[in-house]
């Protein structure tokens, strides 16, 4: 399995998309840097740049990038007509597809880590003290895991549609926008923990996890009002990671099952 993961990483060297994607991870932090002039405190500066990473980069960039990269990884052997040779070796197709999914997981973590470090550089360059930054940096790494799990349904769709890239990308686009909207809608942010959209979809799930870690010692009236409405519905680590572990097991099993049954 480790050898397969290493091979998948070596393939990434030939994919400009990977490096372009990592460059995109710095786009939101750099764009938000222009708004730091209106910030009054170090805490607000850190909260602001990290919220741009959590609520913009993760939702609007990372999830679709994971699906696009997955479509490249999953069908590379078919496009180059090498899957037959791999099966003859033999290479277990379940292990092959799972190694690709693990590479995507590492990419998601790397994406959030790079974005977080760029945020730190922006803060230091503009003279802000990174108060509470490292705590939020760790939360960002964990959100990368949540976004990876959130992308698995779309990756399953990519495998089911079997190289129909356009349809997959269109559906992923709407799924991404839907998650972004759900993460800002009180109707879904104030649902109790259970089998509902506010718990099972990555957008509201990630918001109800990450928002509680912002430094709330100095809050505006609007933020205080939002906290009053949403804080009773914050989720703890056991709840959040319990959900994503179950979802990951289910969708990885389905992806592996469909991938194994595809014709070579």
Predicted regions and their residues:
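Aromatic- and glycine-rich beta-strand/loop motifs that create alpha-glucan
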Residues: 1-22
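Residue-level recognition of transmembrane alpha-helices
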Residues: 21-25, 100-101, 169-173, 244
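Secretory targeting signals
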Residues: 26-68, 98-165, 230-237, 241
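Terminal transmembrane helical anchor/hairpin motif
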Residues: 39-49, 169, 173, 177-258
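Hydrophobic/aromatic residues in alpha-helical transmembrane segments
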Residues: 66-70, 79, 83, 118, ...
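Helix-loop-helix units of permease transmembrane domains in multi-pass membrane transporters
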Residues: 72-105
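Short cytosolic juxtamembrane segments of multi-pass membrane proteins
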Residues: 260-264
């Amino acid at each position: 399995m480790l050898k397969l993961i290493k091979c998948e990483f070596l393939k990434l060297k030939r994919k400009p998309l990977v490096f372009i994607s990592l460059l995109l991870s710095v786009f939101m932090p750099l764009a938000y840097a222009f708004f730091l002039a209106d910030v009054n405190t170090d805490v607000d500066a850190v909260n602001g740049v990290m919220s741009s990473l959590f609520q913009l980069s993760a939702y609007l960039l990372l999830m679709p990038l994971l699906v696009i990269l997955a479509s490249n990884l999953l069908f590379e052997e078919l496009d180059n007509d090498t899957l037959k040779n791999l099966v003859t070796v033999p290479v277990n197709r379940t292990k092959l597809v799972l190694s690709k999914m693990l590479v995507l997981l590492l990419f998601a973590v790397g994406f959030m880590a790079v974005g977080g470090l760029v945020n730190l550089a922006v803060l230091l360059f503009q003279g802000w003290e990174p108060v509470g930054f490292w705590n939020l940096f760790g939360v960002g790494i964990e959100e990368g895991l949540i976004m990876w799990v959130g992308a698995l349904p779309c990756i399953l769709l990519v495998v089911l549609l079997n190289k129909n890239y356009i349809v997959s990308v269109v559906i992923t686009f709407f799924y991404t926008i839907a998650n972004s909207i759900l993460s800002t809608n009180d109707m879904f942010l104030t649902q109790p923990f259970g089998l509902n959209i506010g718990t099972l979809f990555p957008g509201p799930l990630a918001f109800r996890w990450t928002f509680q870690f912002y430094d709330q010692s100095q809050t505006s009236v609007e933020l205080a009002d939002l906290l009053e409405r949403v804080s009773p519905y914050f989720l703890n680590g056991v709840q959040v990671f319990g959900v994503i572990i179950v979802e990951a097991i289910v969708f990885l099993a389905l992806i592996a099952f469909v991938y194994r049954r595809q014709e070579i």
